[in-house]
Amino acid sequence: PMRGNIPIPEIPHGEDIWLIVAVTSIRSRRTQQGVLYCEAIGRNSTGTIALKIWGEVLDTQGELQAGLWGITGKLETFQDRSQFVVSEYRPITIEKYREHQTTDPVLPRAFTFDIETLTLPDFRERVGPQLERLLRLGNMRLEQQQRYLDDIAAEEERCYSLGSLSATSGRVLSIAVHVGPIPGLEFVGMEQPETEHVFGIDADGFEQGERRALFDFLELMKNFDLESDELVGHNIIGFDLPFIFQRCLVHGIQVRPFVNLSEFHVRGVFDTMHRWWLGAKRNVSLDDIAWALGIESSKTSEVEGSKVFDLYQAGKLDVIREYNLNDVRVTRKVYERIVASFGR
């Protein structure tokens, strides 16, 4: 008899096996010869496995959609990559899944996040000498220097404020995260909880420190599954993710980046800025996209990104915390709209 319900890490190669899994991330592909097939991800309480379904199987079995399925096939290796080649599949109920797995399926999650940053206080000591070299003040007579003092002071303040945009001169103040279902991957009979988190500023508006914020964020992300979960944000490939990992380096925190930012199409990441441009590397603000889509902005007359430093100086950390969360809520709405129109 065919073996089945084997823990995913223990599936042998080349043997017919049946499994019960939650299927996600289905994508149509073609070989170099033009042969149609689908790639998908199967997931249950024992692990995650890459699935491959050839066109002739799709023709006889019908469309494979995200959901709970009983599948039959063999584990094979293609170009040094193991895939479970599916020969048959049929939909199952959540009750049937629970009967074989004893627990509910681990559903794909979208982690939508945003960071707020501040310039390091010590950076001010570096700005002055850098400006002196840039403006060649040493070559000016004293009366010339006096003439430009106001301009120099304004430029020094501007350069200092921009320090928050680099991990060499800035730090993380807070990280806000929304965890919820991936749009279009809702499962019948199951409700996926949605949660919000803020690291770095607690619910009472007290600062917790950058090191703790980084640790707490990494703790939340420790079970992030690159094959089925998604990390969502606006310009996170170009800013937020590198900034977080670089600040971990500064603090000596051991971290294996859970996404590969060097990839042309970064797996496991949904960057709303890139998706707005259909993958092109161009800039657009989250606020501009939200306005175009009729989504209420997170910015107010009191708070926006450029005012975070002043709010911090005024001790209004609770306002910064709520602004950080609102940015995430807006990003989540933009994400849902893009997926609804463009798909995955």
Located regions from the model:
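OB-fold nucleic-acid-binding modules
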Residues: 1-27, 91-97
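Short secondary-structure capping/turn segments at boundaries of alpha-helices and beta-strands
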Residues: 5-9, 24-29, 38-39, 159-165
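OB-fold (S1/OB) nucleic-acid-binding surfaces
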Residues: 25-55
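Short beta-strand micro-motifs in enzyme catalytic cores
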Residues: 36-40, 82, 109-111, 173
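Short nucleic-acid-contacting surface segments enriched for D/E, G, S/T with interspersed K/R
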Residues: 55-72
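OB-fold/S1-family single-stranded nucleic acid-binding modules
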Residues: 74-100
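Conserved non-catalytic scaffold segment of RNase H-like nuclease domains
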Residues: 103-246
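Metal-dependent phosphoesterase core characteristic of DEDDh/y 3'-5' exonuclease domains
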Residues: 170-207, 224-322, 326-344
